[in-house]
Regions:
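Glycine-rich phosphate/pyrophosphate-handling loop used in enzymes and phosphotransfer proteins
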Residues: 1-145
């Protein structure tokens, strides 16, 4: 991979960081090796409403308020730590990497769908005052791009 002088200087001054933990990574890597090995991808024949395996789904017995959902990973390991740091430790930069993975999952699972809008889960006033930001709004803004 040939790198221009400008790219080299840019990387030296502003190194790329792991989308999940913030460690410095190679310019072409979205996550570090440690986080990559810890990712548990969502896969299989899953219900688009509840995310359970279809054989265990009971959505036909319940009223749904949305058509479908998707997620790139299970809430565990590096992803869980990254979300926790975003929500409770002020690591708002984690929203960039998480949103990138989430947007890719939407593209793969809803190709051709024209969305009217992207929304976020409202945060209580007390939580907003404590954190100073709404983590789901940060994610929604990035995904909408």
């Amino acid at each position: 991979m040939k790198v221009s002088v400008l790219e080299y200087i840019s990387y030296a001054l502003f190194p790329r960081r792991c989308a999940l933990c913030g460690k410095v990574v190679a310019p072409d890597m979205p996550v570090c090796g440690s986080c990559e090995s810890d990712l548990e991808y969502v896969k299989g024949d899953l219900c688009p409403h509840c995310g359970r395996e279809k054989k265990y789904c009971s959505c036909s017995f319940h009223r749904r308020f949305f058509e479908a959902q998707t997620a790139p990973f299970y809430y565990s390991g590096a992803v869980k730590r990254s979300i926790h740091a975003l929500k409770f430790n002020g690591r708002t930069q984690n929203a960039d990497g998480l949103a990138r993975f989430m947007a890719q999952s939407v593209k793969e699972n809803f190709a051709g769908v024209k969305f009217d809008f992207v929304c976020c889960v409202p945060l209580s006033e007390a939580s907003y005052k404590k954190r100073g930001y709404n983590q789901s709004a940060l994610l929604a803004k990035r995904i909408a791009k």
